[in-house]
């Protein structure tokens, strides 16, 4: 389809070498012929009837044909010696535009003519109006359209929507929750606090959560008055800390008196052997805890300022009212003969 314009200049010519009217002196009915001999014939065709005036182009002395934007293009054909289908090339130049459009339409074959010329009557001209026209842009226009970038439609978004779309990406945890210092403590901090607590209990001699009861046929025993969790500090096995040589001398003295019990506990600390002697009577409860192979407590070393202390911790959860027991670890024959309860 051609764009609607107010006035279009149309130039028509025959595809020959000269581009002139082949009849020269004879009357020519071509609308585009501007020869003086052909002008009367062109004017006679204009006076044929009103039915052809609406679609009839106007001839000018310059060889151009003027037609309005709503009328069809009338093609004027001439027969060549080869009698093949020729194409009529119409050069359309729009007003105020530099890029020309070339339109071609196939030339139908005619079976009759006069002296090699084929003329179109009004009926044929009306039929020719229905023939399609093929528009071809110039080469410069085609190449420029290939390199032309497609235009993008710019859509303005409101600043409020843009802010809302960007806000989720810029959100921080502190926007939802206030900043506060974590109350969780590391494992090393917990161990340090536990050690400080045990140091305080040992240094001050605090022994809570237990009491002494008398057991018939067995003697005194220590019972829990509160539950203890596994690994929790229970009590210190308090006594005199001795080197191995001093401990052996005291043990020989205690052996001379059969009524004296044995409350000496040997252990190693930093590749040295030590002994805690709790034989001397005192109000400390750790020395009164009885022996059992399946006890609920176990011994453990605890150093304060480089000095080892022997303490008892719960080997399992201890309920309130249970007797506190631990394994003495002495399996010698002499000890078992002197104290048969060490077997159990």
Swiss-Prot record:
<dbReference type="GO" id="GO:0140944">
    <property type="term" value="F:histone H4K20 monomethyltransferase activity"/>
</dbReference>
<dbReference type="GO" id="GO:0043516">
    <property type="term" value="P:regulation of DNA damage response, signal transduction by p53 class mediator"/>
</dbReference>
<dbReference type="InterPro" id="IPR001214">
    <property type="entry name" value="SET_dom"/>
</dbReference>
<dbReference type="GO" id="GO:0010628">
    <property type="term" value="P:positive regulation of gene expression"/>
</dbReference>
<keyword id="KW-0804">Transcription</keyword>
<keyword id="KW-0489">Methyltransferase</keyword>
<comment type="function">
    <text>Protein-lysine N-methyltransferase that monomethylates both histones and non-histone proteins. Specifically monomethylates 'Lys-20' of histone H4 (H4K20me1). H4K20me1 is enriched during mitosis and represents a specific tag for epigenetic transcriptional repression. Mainly functions in euchromatin regions, thereby playing a central role in the silencing of euchromatic genes. Required for cell proliferation, probably by contributing to the maintenance of proper higher-order structure of DNA during mitosis. Involved in chromosome condensation and proper cytokinesis.</text>
</comment>
<feature type="domain" description="SET">
    <location>
        <begin position="208"/>
        <end position="329"/>
    </location>
</feature>
<dbReference type="GO" id="GO:0042054">
    <property type="term" value="F:histone methyltransferase activity"/>
</dbReference>
<feature type="compositionally biased region" description="Basic residues">
    <location>
        <begin position="145"/>
        <end position="160"/>
    </location>
</feature>
<dbReference type="GO" id="GO:0032259">
    <property type="term" value="P:methylation"/>
</dbReference>
<dbReference type="GO" id="GO:0009953">
    <property type="term" value="P:dorsal/ventral pattern formation"/>
</dbReference>
<dbReference type="GO" id="GO:0051301">
    <property type="term" value="P:cell division"/>
</dbReference>
<protein>
    <recommendedName>
        <fullName>N-lysine methyltransferase KMT5A-A</fullName>
        <ecNumber>2.1.1.-</ecNumber>
        <ecNumber>2.1.1.361</ecNumber>
    </recommendedName>
</protein>
<keyword id="KW-0805">Transcription regulation</keyword>
<feature type="region of interest" description="Disordered">
    <location>
        <begin position="143"/>
        <end position="176"/>
    </location>
</feature>
<keyword id="KW-0158">Chromosome</keyword>
<comment type="similarity">
    <text>Belongs to the class V-like SAM-binding methyltransferase superfamily. Histone-lysine methyltransferase family. PR/SET subfamily.</text>
</comment>
<keyword id="KW-0808">Transferase</keyword>
<feature type="binding site">
    <location>
        <begin position="290"/>
        <end position="291"/>
    </location>
    <ligand>
        <name>S-adenosyl-L-methionine</name>
    </ligand>
</feature>
<keyword id="KW-0498">Mitosis</keyword>
<dbReference type="GO" id="GO:0005634">
    <property type="term" value="C:nucleus"/>
</dbReference>
<keyword id="KW-0678">Repressor</keyword>
<keyword id="KW-0156">Chromatin regulator</keyword>
<keyword id="KW-0949">S-adenosyl-L-methionine</keyword>
<dbReference type="InterPro" id="IPR047266">
    <property type="entry name" value="KMT5A-like_SET"/>
</dbReference>
<dbReference type="GO" id="GO:0005700">
    <property type="term" value="C:polytene chromosome"/>
</dbReference>
<dbReference type="InterPro" id="IPR046341">
    <property type="entry name" value="SET_dom_sf"/>
</dbReference>
<keyword id="KW-0539">Nucleus</keyword>
<dbReference type="Pfam" id="PF00856">
    <property type="entry name" value="SET"/>
</dbReference>
<keyword id="KW-0132">Cell division</keyword>
<feature type="binding site">
    <location>
        <begin position="218"/>
        <end position="220"/>
    </location>
    <ligand>
        <name>S-adenosyl-L-methionine</name>
    </ligand>
</feature>
<feature type="binding site">
    <location>
        <position position="263"/>
    </location>
    <ligand>
        <name>S-adenosyl-L-methionine</name>
    </ligand>
</feature>
<dbReference type="GO" id="GO:0006357">
    <property type="term" value="P:regulation of transcription by RNA polymerase II"/>
</dbReference>
<dbReference type="GO" id="GO:0042799">
    <property type="term" value="F:histone H4K20 methyltransferase activity"/>
</dbReference>
<dbReference type="InterPro" id="IPR016858">
    <property type="entry name" value="KMT5A-like"/>
</dbReference>
<keyword id="KW-0131">Cell cycle</keyword>
<dbReference type="InterPro" id="IPR051760">
    <property type="entry name" value="KMT5A"/>
</dbReference>
């Amino acid at each position: 389809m051609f764009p609607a314009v107010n006035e279009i200049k149309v130039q028509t010519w025959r595809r020959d070498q000269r581009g002139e009217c082949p009849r020269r002196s004879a009357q020519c009915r071509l609308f585009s012929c501007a020869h003086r001999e052909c002008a009367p014939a062109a004017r006679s065709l204009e006076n044929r009837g009103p039915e052809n005036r609406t679609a009839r182009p106007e001839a000018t002395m310059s060889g151009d044909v003027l037609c309005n934007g709503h009328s069809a293009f009338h093609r004027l054909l001439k027969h060549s010696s080869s009698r093949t289908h020729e194409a009529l090339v119409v050069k359309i130049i729009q007003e105020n535009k530099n890029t020309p459009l070339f339109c071609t339409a196939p030339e139908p074959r005619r079976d009759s003519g006069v002296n090699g010329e084929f003329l179109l009557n009004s009926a044929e001209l009306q039929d020719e109006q229905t023939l399609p026209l093929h528009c071809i842009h110039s080469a410069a226009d085609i190449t420029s359209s290939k390199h032309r970038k497609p235009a993008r439609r710019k859509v303005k978004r409101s600043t409020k929507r843009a802010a809302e779309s960007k806000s989720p990406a810029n959100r921080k945890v502190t926007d939802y929750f206030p900043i506060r210092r974590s109350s969780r403590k590391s494992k090393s901090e917990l161990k340090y606090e536990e050690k400080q607590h045990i140091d305080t209990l040992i240094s001050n001699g605090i022994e809570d959560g237990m009491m002494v009861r008398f057991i018939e046929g067995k003697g005194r025993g220590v019972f829990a008055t509160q539950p203890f969790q596994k690994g929790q500090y229970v009590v210190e096995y308090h006594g005199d800390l001795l080197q191995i040589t001093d401990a052996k001398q005291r043990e020989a003295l205690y052996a001379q008196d059969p009524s004296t019990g044995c409350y000496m506990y040997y252990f190693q600390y930093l590749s040295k052997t030590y002994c805690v002697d709790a034989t001397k009577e005192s109000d400390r409860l750790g020395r009164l805890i009885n022996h059992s192979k399946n006890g609920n407590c176990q011994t453990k070393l605890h150093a304060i300022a480089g000095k080892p202390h022997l303490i008892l911790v719960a080997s399992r959860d201890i309920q309130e009212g249970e007797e506190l027991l631990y394994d003495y670890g002495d399996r010698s024959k002499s000890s078992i003969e002197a104290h048969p309860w060490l077997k159990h």
